[in-house]
Amino acid sequence: MKQEFRANGKLLITGEYLVLQGAWALALPLNKGQSMSVETIEAAQLHWQAYSQGKLWFEAIFNNKLNVIKSSDPAYSQRLQNILNMALKQDSETIEKMLGVRVRTELEFDPRWGWGSSSTLLYLLSTWLGINPYKLLDLSFGGSGYDIACAGSNKPIFYRRLPQQKPEIEEVTFNPPFIDRLYLLWLEKKQSSSSEVKAFLQKDQAQPEAIEKINTIGCAMLRSQSAEAFGLLMKQHELIISQILRRPMVKELHFSDFDGYIKSLGAWGGDFALINSPLPNSALCGYFADKGFHTLLSLKSVML
């Protein structure tokens, strides 16, 4: 018997960092994600194979106590073992599902891009084992859970999760008339989401005024019918988060002479930035290549 599951990647458009304190966040599920198949084998073991863009990059075998028998990457097998044990904390009977199977995962995007390699894994595991993915997130990587919501959504979402409460998820439509001038620029430095989450929560207190402003900006961006108005909202959002983090805005840092608007996405300092510009694709590619950045994607091409 073979079971198959799939999870969408994610992109956070508004609310980065403050979504951890209960801000509403606009997030997009992506057409690239991660799939998982579970197939029965004779041995009372868990045989795990992980592929990335068609290539096997990790393989491990766990015994009936979930101890590692064999592994191609001891550090990752330890990390995976911890997640599986966290799943058992929710429901000890899931051990019966974990044994006597071969699990194969297939990541569809470059893991350096920060599109949800961890969140899609948690969602897939939770769907297979029949447990709560948000609880598994809390026990493992931590975070707001918007990425878990994107993993199982077929539409853009507004997402909020207040402390000690269940997530609030509202499906929305995001297809502005100027979407053809929105792009994603990879800043070529993978940020650790879990590390950023921990650092932010350790040093920052709640920001009620900033949260209210970000909520208003997110709603306005969703309704915006003008590329210029949308760009000004991007700029306002960037300024608020910049002041909270005490970090320079990405446009100030790398692209001060750019004709258009640029907003950081996700963990600042790496991952992707949102580009809003009237320049044609060829001119944009040339400009960013001259700055040392070579991966530019249209937003429309990655949205689910």
Predicted stretch roles:
Residues 2-8, 19, 35-97, 105-106, ...:
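C-terminal nucleotide
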Residues 27-29:
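Phosphoinositide-binding peripheral membrane targeting modules
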Residues 31-33:
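Extended active-site and interfacial segments that coordinate phosphate-rich ligands
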Residues 101:
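Nucleotide and nucleotide-moiety/phosphate-recognizing core
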